[in-house]
């Protein structure tokens, strides 16, 4: 009971701090400049590359990666178990995870079932806990995604991956526990078939879905969570109870990256597929005007907001709120991102200036795990681990 009260106090303290601080210095700042190439206190380090060989049986595809990352995965899985046990000390919930979730594996699409079994075998983590690790990305992805088009019609796509809100606050160093534990698990992935790249992505070791990636020469895709009362928790409950006609958002993104052959095909799938959780799909292409934010509920598309440079719309910015609504007053990353893009101007957009925008507080915040920069046409994909030293807002 004491642990639960302490957690409540910490969350309230963080919320009050954010409500007071987000709109005033030093938690906000003027648009950053000259932060690229990454260096200094906001740069944690590079992200390693691994090849995922799609010609291998699904059970074996992740073995090399998971041999390296098993210790870090065990740390975060154990933390999640301890967090669950803090609310249910009997351990029955974790017991149910270990005993019941593997029985649901036959409901997962494509190769994901065998891939998760392979990860469990290599890491010696119970299969139910590997499934839980893959499920919880449906709920806590709070991000900023941007697509820009310069004066020559060249497209860039960038994102901050913010993850881990309310999953434990470390009062000793003012960080989110899960955010910090995800950084050693962050990897760049080159998915290959016949020794040729099919797509590239940034992900977390142990997670077989995708949240950030691109298909060279064709399109780029990122996912942002969309908050809704009829949200991911409801979708997961329905799925567990047997209603399995909706797709997991991380799995549909991977499927699109792996199988779609054009921007328009990807757009159609992301617009029309029934999904487990509401989401924003941020999709970029390789030609002028090929960039959009698809606002989704679980059943249908609510809005498609597209680049239109002839009408002066040379960028789209998506955080975690519908574009026709004001952001939550405790969490306005949209306004500073747009302000910094406008100050940058269309003539000066580049990897360097996009990184500057994503390095400006509160777009950069305590939840930021990594920043990704994507150039579909040139085939460039860069990912950098981030830090946000104090003073820095919690989200």
Curated annotation (Swiss-Prot):
Enzyme Commission (EC) number: 3.5.1.23, 3.5.1.-
Post-translational modification: N-glycosylated. Proteolytically cleaved into two chains alpha and beta that remain associated via a disulfide bond. Cleavage gives rise to a conformation change that activates the enzyme. The same catalytic Cys residue mediates the autoproteolytic cleavage and subsequent hydrolysis of lipid substrates. The beta chain may undergo an additional C-terminal processing.
Known catalytic reactions: an N-acylsphing-4-enine + H2O = sphing-4-enine + a fatty acid; N-dodecanoylsphing-4-enine + H2O = dodecanoate + sphing-4-enine; N-tetradecanoylsphing-4-enine + H2O = tetradecanoate + sphing-4-enine; N-hexadecanoylsphing-4-enine + H2O = sphing-4-enine + hexadecanoate
Keyword Hydrolase in annotation: yes
One of the record's GO molecular function terms: N-acylsphingosine amidohydrolase activity
Cystine bridges: 31-340, 388-392
Site (Important for catalytic activity): 162, 320, 333
Cellular compartment(s): Lysosome; Secreted
Pathway: Lipid metabolism; sphingolipid metabolism
Record InterPro entries: Acid_ceramidase-like, Acid_ceramidase_N, CBAH/NAAA_C
Carbohydrate-modified residues: 173, 259, 342, 348
One Gene Ontology cellular component: membrane
Active-site residues (renumbered): 143 (nucleophile)
Signal peptide: 1-21
One record GO biological process: sphingolipid metabolic process
Keywords from the UniProt entry: Disulfide bond, Glycoprotein, Hydrolase, Lipid metabolism, Lysosome, Secreted, Signal, Sphingolipid metabolism, Zymogen
PANTHER family per record: ACID AMIDASE, ACID CERAMIDASE
Function description: Lysosomal ceramidase that hydrolyzes sphingolipid ceramides into sphingosine and free fatty acids at acidic pH. Ceramides, sphingosine, and its phosphorylated form sphingosine-1-phosphate are bioactive lipids that mediate cellular signaling pathways regulating several biological processes including cell proliferation, apoptosis and differentiation. Has a higher catalytic efficiency towards C12-ceramides versus other ceramides. Also catalyzes the reverse reaction allowing the synthesis of ceramides from fatty acids and sphingosine.
Subunit relationships: Heterodimer; disulfide-linked. The heterodimer is composed of the disulfide-linked alpha and beta chains produced by autocatalytic cleavage of the precursor.
Similarity comment: Belongs to the acid ceramidase family.
Name of the molecule in the record: Acid ceramidase
Organism listed in the record: Balaenoptera acutorostrata scammoni
Lineage, top ranks: Eukaryota, Metazoa, Chordata, Craniata, Vertebrata
């Amino acid at each position: 009971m004491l642990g639960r009260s302490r957690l409540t106090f910490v969350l309230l303290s963080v919320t009050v701090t954010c409500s007071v601080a987000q709109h005033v210095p030093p938690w906000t700042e003027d648009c950053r400049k000259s932060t690229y190439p990454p260096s200094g206190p906001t740069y944690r380090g590079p992200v390693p590359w691994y090849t995922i060989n799609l010609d291998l049986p699904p059970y074996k595809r992740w073995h090399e990666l998971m041999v390296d990352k098993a210790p870090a995965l065990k740390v975060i899985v154990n933390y999640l178990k301890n967090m669950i046990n803090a609310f249910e000390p009997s351990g029955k919930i974790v017991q149910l995870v270990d005993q019941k979730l593997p029985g649901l594996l036959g409901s997962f699409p494509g190769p994901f079932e065998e891939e998760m079994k392979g990860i469990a075998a290599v890491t010696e983590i119970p299969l139910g806990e590997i499934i839980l690790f893959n499920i919880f990305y449906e709920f806590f992805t709070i991000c900023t995604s941007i697509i820009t088009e310069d004066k020559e019609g060249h497209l860039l796509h960038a994102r901050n991956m913010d993850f881990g809100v309310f999953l434990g606050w470390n009062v000793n160093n003012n960080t989110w526990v899960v955010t910090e534990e995800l950084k050693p698990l962050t990897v760049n992935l080159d998915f290959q078939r016949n020794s040729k790249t099919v797509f590239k992505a940034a992900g977390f070791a142990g997670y077989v879905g995708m949240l950030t990636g691109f298909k060279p020469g064709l399109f780029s895709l990122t996912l942002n969570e969309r908050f809704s009362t009829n949200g991911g928790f409801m979708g997961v409950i329905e799925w567990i109870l047997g209603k399995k006609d909706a797709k997991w958002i991380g799995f549909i993104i991977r499927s699109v990256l792996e199988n779609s052959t054009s921007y328009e095909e990807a757009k159609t799938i992301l617009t029309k597929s029934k999904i487990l959780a509401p989401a924003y799909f941020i999709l970029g292409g390789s030609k002028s005007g090929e960039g959009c934010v698809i606002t989704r509920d679980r059943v249908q598309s609510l809005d498609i907001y597209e680049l239109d440079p002839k009408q002066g719309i040379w960028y789209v910015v998506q955080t975690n709120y519908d574009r026709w609504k004001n952001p939550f007053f405790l969490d306005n990353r949209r306004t500073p991102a747009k302000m910094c893009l406008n100050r940058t101007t269309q003539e000066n957009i580049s990897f360097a200036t996009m990184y500057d925008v994503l390095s400006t507080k509160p777009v950069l915040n305590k939840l930021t795990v990594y920043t990704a920069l994507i150039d579909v046409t040139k085939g460039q994909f860069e990912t950098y681990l981030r830090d946000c030293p104090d003073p820095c807002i919690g989200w």
